[in-house]
């Protein structure tokens, strides 16, 4: 890596997902607004709180809801059946 290309605030930051109780130490320039947290190694790091991450997002955890697409398609067809039938009669 080239020397002296990173901003002054490039440091190790703790990204912590409180809903999954999991965190990652990553070098970043992310603003932490003065929040810190003691990590498992006993050191205190700037803290960037996450609302969701790959540890808590339903798509990554496999707990997503399946949308009933058949029901939605049939509702669409019922609503626009008259429009479609008049369109077919005109041709």
From Swiss-Prot:
Q: Which domain of life is it from?
A: Bacteria
Alphabetical list of InterPro entries matching this protein = Ribosomal_bL28/bL31-like_sf, Ribosomal_bL31, Ribosomal_bL31_B, Ribosomal_bL31_sf
Ribonucleoprotein keyword on record: yes
> What is the gene name?
rpmE2
The family classification in the record reads: Belongs to the bacterial ribosomal protein bL31 family. Type B subfamily.
Question: Which GO cellular component terms are attached?
Answer: ribonucleoprotein complex; ribosome
- Cystine pairs: none
The family database entries (NCBIfam families) matched by this protein are listed as: L31, PRK01678.1
The answer to whether the entry has keyword Isomerase is no
Provenance organism: Neisseria gonorrhoeae (strain NCCP11945)
**Which Gene Ontology biological process is one annotated for this entry?**
translation
Subunit structure of this chain's protein:
Part of the 50S ribosomal subunit.
Q: Which PANTHER family match?
A: 50S RIBOSOMAL PROTEIN L31, CHLOROPLASTIC, LARGE RIBOSOMAL SUBUNIT PROTEIN BL31C
Alphabetical keyword list: Ribonucleoprotein, Ribosomal protein
Q: What is this protein called?
A: Large ribosomal subunit protein bL31B
Q: Which GO terms describe its molecular function?
A: structural constituent of ribosome
